Amino acid sequence: MKLFTKIFSPLIHHQANADALLLSEQLNRQDHHALIFPDFLQSITLDYSLISLRKLDHYLHKVRVHFRLANQQPQFAQQHTKLIDEMTRIVLRVGAYLGETIRQQNKKWIWIENKEEIYTESDVLKTTVLILTDHDNLTSPMQ
């Protein structure tokens, strides 16, 4: 069993690492899927450094203020859905960038996939979550 894990484990994690890297590179996307405040994101050098994380923290402060104000306004269901979608894109992309920064600063860390099932009253939603691990610790920067 150890031989199997030693040979195939890096192959399995390689895809999760590639997926997270791709998602982290979506931070300054400039199309209809761009995040809010794209000019602010463009001003940040996204080089997976600790300095870039500090600047992203300023971005997240602007985002929190924006969503706090947006939630104080009356909304139709479509507007609310749009806000949730935007918030989800921000959490996933910034979380992936945070995880990639950790991974690039310390090569012991890798992404792994965790399959989850969420039970609702009428359905079971199956999803895969990327989790960062150094084989002793786990963290979920995208949640």
Predicted regions and their residues:
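Aromatic- and glycine-enriched beta-alpha-beta binding-site module
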Residues: 86-124
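A recognition module on extended beta-rich or small alphabeta surfaces enriched in W/G with H and D/E
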Residues: 41, 120-143
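Intrinsically disordered, low-complexity coil segments
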Residues: 68-83, 107, 117-123, 135-138
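N-terminal low-complexity, intrinsically disordered segments
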Residues: 1-90
